[in-house]
Regions:
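Residue-level preference for short coil/turn positions at secondary-structure junctions
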Residues: 43, 94-95, 130, 142
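Domain-level recognition of soluble alpha/beta enzyme cores
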Residues: 119-147, 152-156
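A short, polar/proline- and glycine-enriched secondary-structure boundary/capping micro-motif
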Residues: 16, 156-157
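Non-DNA-binding regulatory cores of transcription-related proteins
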Residues: 95-100, 105-133
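Short phosphate-binding loop-to-helix
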Residues: 77-96
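A polyampholytic, Gly/Pro-enriched intrinsically disordered region
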Residues: 92-102, 144-152
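Active-site-proximal alpha-helix that buttresses catalytic centers in soluble enzyme cores
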Residues: 2-83, 109, 120-122, 128-132
Length: 157
């Protein structure tokens, strides 16, 4: 099973847009990352995001670029800084296929650490904030590894 964790793309400031939709740059970042994941055949059964507009937009634009519109959903549990990762880990354990989560850096870092080394505080990956960085974890049960990570500044075009 694969789990791709995506730190949201560039968003507008509160002054530019109180709801903080993603910017034009963010739209390009999300399209590029979605196309890249599609090119390697990644087609998650669900694309989760938080209640924040910029994570919703990131997930929606990426899903469209992957040809997977309609597979996005707000996580049924909070996925913000400091929130428990146990509900996400339980969803992964019960999933029938691959998953993707577009979220916030603290939560994603702790989820990756919990999967790979069963310790949320032991950092196993790093995200470049706000730029659509993706990290792919592959495994099952208590055996997970990081298989790749992409940053926008590493992506072609």
């Amino acid at each position: 099973m694969k789990v791709v964790l995506v730190h949201h793309v560039n968003a507008l400031t509160k002054e530019q847009d109180p709801q903080r939709h993603i910017s034009e740059l963010g739209q390009a970042q999300a399209k590029r990352l979605g196309a890249r994941l599609k090119a390697i055949g990644f087609a998650p059964e669900r694309i989760l995001h938080s209640e924040a507009q910029w994570t919703t937009d990131t997930a929606t634009v990426m899903a469209a670029a992957m040809g997977l519109a309609g597979r996005t959903a707000q996580a049924a549990y909070p996925i913000n800084t400091g929130d428990a990762v146990a509900p996400f880990l339980a969803e992964i354990a019960e999933a029938k296929g691959d998953l993707m989560m577009c979220g916030h850096v603290d939560y994603l870092l702790r989820a990756a650490s919990a999967l790979v080394c069963n310790d949320e505080q032991r950092k196993v990956v790093e995200f470049k904030p706000g730029n659509g960085t993706a990290v792919c974890l592959e495994g099952a049960g208590s055996e997970w590894v990081v298989t790749f990570a992409w940053r926008q500044d590493h992506a072609p075009g």
